[in-house]
Amino acid sequence: MNPDRVLESFLEMVAIESPSWHEAPMAAYCAGKLAEMGFTVTFDASAAETGSDTGNLIAHLAGTVPGRIGFSAHLDTVKPCAGIEAVIEQRHICDDITCRMAEVVCSAGETILSADDKAGIAAIFEGLRSVLESGAPRPDITVLLTTCEEQSLLGAGALAEDA
């Protein structure tokens, strides 16, 4: 696991506007990153049903051992998400036993940070990169990134109807 790479990936993602129904730029970014990792990327036809400007992203990578595993997250964020400026602040993090300084990523302005669900996607991508770089045996891997989750799971619902 490379913490610097996770942070870099997350900061790249939060700079991409992706409100519900307008996830295409985020989908294109994710498709490119998954393709770089060797995944075959497709999009379903759910946009016709959800009204989004893209379908759900479905990516597959053949495994080296039997079995399969899946990861899922969503591409959209709530508003306001235009012009997000992420900043890294040093803050004291305290629990019952220890206090320490930690870096915290937050929004600099009047927008949300878009951590929901871009932090999840960054974590999935870093986990995938780490496994692939290790050369460890792995089962087939599927990644599903849905649209319009913030709108009553429209993308996931459209996918389920196609299944």
Model-derived segments and their meaning:
Residues 40, 98-99, 109-163:
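Acidic/histidine-rich catalytic neighborhood of metal-dependent amide-processing enzymes
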Residues 1-21:
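N-terminal capping segment at the start of a domain
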Residues 60-115:
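Catalytic-core environment of secreted peptidases
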Residues 12, 32-33, 130:
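Alpha-helical scaffold elements within enzyme catalytic domains, especially in hydrolases
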Residues 25, 80-82, 155:
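Short glycine-/acidic-enriched loop or helix-start segments at secondary-structure transitions
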Residues 19-66:
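A non-catalytic alpha/beta surface segment that caps or lines the substrate-entry region
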